[in-house]
């Protein structure tokens, strides 16, 4: 299901990251009283009154400065393009500035719902000052205090009221997957071979595919949507604005995918950039399949696949759950296995385990390995329940979450994998204090 997207934008140092953290109720964005701290967009899922949505935090928009400021503005412009609803955050202490007016004009041209929020309205006198912001022409300003939380509920009410009408429920039946990787590993060729036609421009130049292209297709009665992304370059090589857009669109494709195919090049082996690319998908919590393309090129023997697989497992230890598929876009070798493997991973990441079964597993796990002890205090595990899917997320109720050592968390994840088929999907464990 594609969730509504909400973007928080504004000039530097008005409290966007603090508002972002307040809405998602956790500190994900770096917050510092210094303009330009948030350079990249931060994504997180949020929920208000039963309405789930994707929230984007952006860096401060400015038309002054140098290359870094231009890149930050490009990031924000992409967020604006992706958003269904835009929150323009201003600061009552600064009053209305020329920069506020320029940003307001930019947002007005989008023809999208824009909600004007005035931050740092911490007392009645400051709340009276918000009337100056009517001059921006964006409707009624909403006074908020990101740091204290006042007015956030009113803001969220307004946000969900502006969400677009829900799309046809048939969209829920479509399995979305994207192919990611550094440039020139053959992603576009894989898409064309998979679809049986030239949908994406293919050339032997890096960066041929600038945009991410969504293409629906049906295989064995199952509906899929494949997103072929522009190759992700090493950060030091991202100079042109168009290349910056390519990286941003690839990130967006990952966010919009159920399953991500990490494409490696068998002819060049694993590069450092492959690890960065894999990290994007892993951190997003998406299902992952490792696809080794150009398997027709290197000289091989009977042990070549096993040797390459060992190298993959060594270099991508955090992706030990991801299946590996050796293919050739040129010859078509094993391309027909991609849809069924995507469907298998999708099913695995959406399965639910009954709480009674999970607690039987916990009991058996406690007999295998004792719970950790820190400073003379032992972790006590009471029960476990699954709270969400895609990725499978489990809450473990304990006496003190601080006692949940990462090694024991990993042990519980391994127990889940041994007892249930979670091939291709990450698993999240969330320790919570029993009330």
Swiss-Prot record:
GO terms for biological process: ribosome biogenesis. Residues 4-167, 175-350 form the EngA-type G domain. One of its GO terms (molecular function) is GTP binding. GTP 1 binds at residues 10-17, 57-61, 119-122. Residues 351-435 form the KH-like domain. Keywords: GTP-binding, Nucleotide-binding, Repeat, Ribosome biogenesis. GTP 2 binds at residues 181-188, 228-232, 293-296. PANTHER family: GTPASE DER. Belongs to the TRAFAC class TrmE-Era-EngA-EngB-Septin-like GTPase superfamily. EngA (Der) GTPase family. Associates with the 50S ribosomal subunit. GTPase that plays an essential role in the late steps of ribosome biogenesis. This is GTPase Der.
């Amino acid at each position: 299901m594609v969730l509504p997207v909400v973007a928080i934008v504004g000039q530097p140092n008005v409290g966007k990251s603090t508002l972002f953290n307040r809405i998602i109720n956790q500190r994900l964005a770096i917050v510092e009283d210094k303009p330009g701290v948030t350079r990249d967009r931060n994504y997180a899922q949020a929920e208000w009154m039963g309405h789930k949505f994707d929230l984007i935090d952006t860096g401060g928009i400015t038309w002054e400065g140098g290359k870094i400021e231009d890149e930050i503005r490009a990031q924000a412009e992409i967020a604006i393009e992706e958003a269904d609803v835009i929150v323009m955050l201003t600061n009552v202490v600064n009053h209305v500035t020329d920069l506020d007016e320029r940003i307001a004009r930019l947002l007005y041209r989008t023809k999208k719902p824009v909600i004007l929020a005035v931050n740092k309205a911490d007392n009645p006198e400051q709340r009276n000052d918000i009337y100056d912001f009517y001059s921006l022409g964006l409707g009624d300003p909403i006074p908020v205090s990101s740091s204290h939380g006042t007015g956030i509920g009113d803001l969220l009410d307004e946000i969900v009221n502006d969400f677009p009408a829900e799309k046809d429920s048939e969209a829920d039946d479509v399995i979305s997957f994207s192919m990611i990787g550094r440039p020139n590993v053959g992603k576009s060729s894989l898409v064309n071979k998979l679809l049986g036609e030239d949908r994406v421009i293919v050339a032997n130049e890096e960066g041929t595919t600038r945009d991410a292209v969504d293409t629906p297709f049906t295989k064995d009665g199952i509906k899929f949507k494949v997103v072929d992304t522009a190759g992700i370059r090493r950060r030091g090589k991202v100079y042109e604005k168009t290349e910056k857009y390519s990286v941003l669109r690839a990130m967006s494709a990952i966010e919009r995918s159920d399953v991500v195919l990490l494409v490696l090049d068998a002819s060049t082996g694993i590069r450092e950039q492959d690890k960065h690319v894999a990290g994007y998908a892993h951190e997003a919590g998406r299902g992952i399949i490792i696809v080794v393309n150009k398997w027709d090129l290197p000289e091989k023997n009977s042990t070549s696949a096993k040797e390459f697989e060992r190298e993959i497992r060594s270099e991508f230890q955090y992706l030990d759950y991801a299946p590996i598929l050796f293919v050739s876009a040129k010859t078509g070798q094993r391309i027909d296995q991609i849809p069924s493997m995507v469907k298998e991973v999708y099913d695995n990441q959406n399965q639910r385990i009954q709480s009674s079964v999970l607690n039987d597993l916990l009991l058996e796990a406690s007999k295998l390995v004792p719970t950790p002890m820190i400073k003379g205090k032992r972790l006590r595990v009471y029960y476990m329940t699954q709270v969400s899917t895609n990725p499978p997320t489990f809450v473990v109720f304990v006496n003190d979450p601080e006692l949940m050592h990462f090694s024991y968390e990993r042990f519980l994840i391994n127990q889940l994998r041994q007892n249930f088929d979670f091939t291709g999907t990450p698993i999240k464990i969330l320790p919570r204090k029993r009330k």
